[in-house]
Curated annotation (Swiss-Prot):
Naturally occurring in which organism (per UniProt): Mus musculus (Mouse)
KW Repeat (keyword) present: yes
One example GO MF annotation: RNA polymerase binding
Keywords: Repeat
Ranges annotated as biased composition (Low complexity): 14-25
Full protein name: Transcription elongation regulator 1-like protein
InterPro entries: FF_domain (IPR002713), FF_domain_sf (IPR036517), TCRG1-like (IPR045148), WW_dom (IPR001202), WW_dom_sf (IPR036020)
FF domain mapped to chain residues: 454-507, 519-574
Stretch list, region Disordered: 1-29, 285-344, 382-450
Biased composition, class Basic and acidic residues, residue ranges: 306-332, 382-391
Amino acid sequence: MLAGARLQRRRRQLQQPQQPRWRQPLPWPMNADPPPPPWVWMVPGTAGLLRLGAGVAPPPVLLASAQPASAPLLPRLPGWPAPGEPLLPLLPLSSAPDHAAVHHYPLLHGQWLFGGHSPSIGLAPSSAVELVPLFPHVCPSTLSPPVGKNWIDKRMPNYKIFFNNPFALDSTWMYPEESVLFHSHEKTHFLANQVTPSLSRPTPASRPLPTVVLAAQPIPGGCHDSLKPISRGPTITITAATAAAAATAMVSVDPEELRGLSPSIMQPCHFLTLTPIRIPFRTAPFSDKGKEHSRAPRSPALMLRAPERKSLVGDKEDKEPPPILVRGEETAAKGNKPVASTPVPGSPWCVVWTGDDRVFFFNPTMQLSVWEKPVDLQNRGDLKRIIEDPPHKRKLEASATESSDGSSSDDGSEDQSVKTKRNRTESCEGPGPEDTHQVDKGPQTPPPQILLPLEERVTHFRDMLLERGVSAFSTWEKELHKIVFDPRYLLLNSEERKQIFEQFVKTRIKEEYKERKSKLLLAKEEFKKLLEESKVSPRTTFKEFAEKHGRDQRFRLVQKRKDQEHFFNQFILILKKRDKENRLRLRKMR
């Protein structure tokens, strides 16, 4: 019984006329990738401006009159040199965005701005806002998006259409034949007389809005399929009046009755020629500099530039002398210059003192100067002693002691010094008439410095290398920090310094090798004495010995760890041999 009732119910449902099922269109969130065509774009029944968020731009549009919701797809247009995807007319909406259908299919990231025939809408200029004019019953084409942001020319018989990535903010300027730029106060005159105004520049603004002219063009006879010729279409004008204080956008629609239309056939369409003149929004200076070089050559450009501001004190600025480049050494204070340096033993760092008794650390291998103590020198106990004992103060103290010794000399020497001082003051009392005449002529040049002969300078430089302990086994760059602050360093130029350094290294390397060998022998003897005094047994290890006697000065004389272990192992072998010999003797005695 239940099965029969179900079958009867199913037959009744099949006999009833079924209503056509319409696929509910899905809204496209504009922050996501676009779906595959065809697209349906819901717009209200009145004209207005749509303000979109950054990066959102509609596809190319086709202006059409009212059509029913169930209108079929338009077939491919003959003579259209583009892929043959069809055009899908949009569903007409009755009124403004208050309608329920608009809320049902919202345009995300958009805000509708509407008004009467000539509303004044105040908009704050912003680089993240795009203004798109929308008109009732607009059909987006499913043509492939244009490459680049260049204008693509789509032609039909006796007709021309410009498509672009609409209102994409860019710093390029396209100049089609229909481009017109005018002020907002010229709009009324333009609409009344239908005369194209002359090109004029708007008043400069910090961030102007784009100025766009949209004009509907009639399609002459010879259109195909459902496209019919139209005598005149409505003229739509959008202008942007720029000013320093604020910017406003004007939209006006001048409707006229369309003539020559037949109600029996499909409602005619007419195309819209889009000719924007875009003023770029610059968020930062020189932001588009890199793009200009990478762009290919384009059609003639229209450049709008604000007039340069002339300063009121321009004459004074012209009279001012040009700036003079001065070396950092001349501008730096004398107290900031380095006075002396001392290398820290066992590390690549050296301590440098300045004239104002400040201390910084310099690494010549890395060419690095640091005011704070480096990590390598954090646990050095001798660093404080080095900082507290600067070498330049030692010299001052030594000179002060010498002067004090000289002051305790006999009275005769004091009388002689007084006489010499008197003679100096008498000779320097005042210049004679000839001297005053020379002084009046101009500033005297300082007397030329007498240079020592080259041989003496070379000997002084060699003495400096010996005194500073420059190693013959090192390089010029590593040893530079030892000699760069010595006044004798400046006796030679850079080429002569390096030549003498190379000669010094060649002659010095043999002597230094002998010195190193003798030092190593002395250190070895001292190390053996330490081993003998420590009473090491053959079973003790080097680690135990180093922990116990590592702070001894004789242990530190041998600097390399390998040498220390080698000497220790040699001593242990000698001890083992002695033990064996002693055991053999004891066995023989038994």
